[in-house]
């Protein structure tokens, strides 16, 4: 799946993502920590947000299917769903030191062994 993030959001994600695959881990973690009912989906194209260059996102078939279904229900793109989820998640992340630490532990746990 191809993802285009607004520049500010891309910078926030980059602060947490250190190696290849971390973006997908962050998206999956954010999806599990944001309540779908409370989400306000923001259109990325129509809002005229400056977007970064496209990047590939590998979240797995189950998550991809769930994102597509959600996007169809809302009548928006999958990119708009992911951007909205990440923006809401990073608002919470800035306010919660515990959530930030939980994310970092989750990322480290999922990386597995990295040679030094």
Predicted segments, located by residue:
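Short, positively charged interaction helices/loops
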Residues: 37-73, 92-116
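Surface-exposed, Lys/Arg-rich phosphate-binding patches that contact polyanionic backbones
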Residues: 6-26, 61-80, 84, 102
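Short, basic amphipathic alpha-helical segments that act as recognition/interaction helices
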Residues: 21-44, 76-100
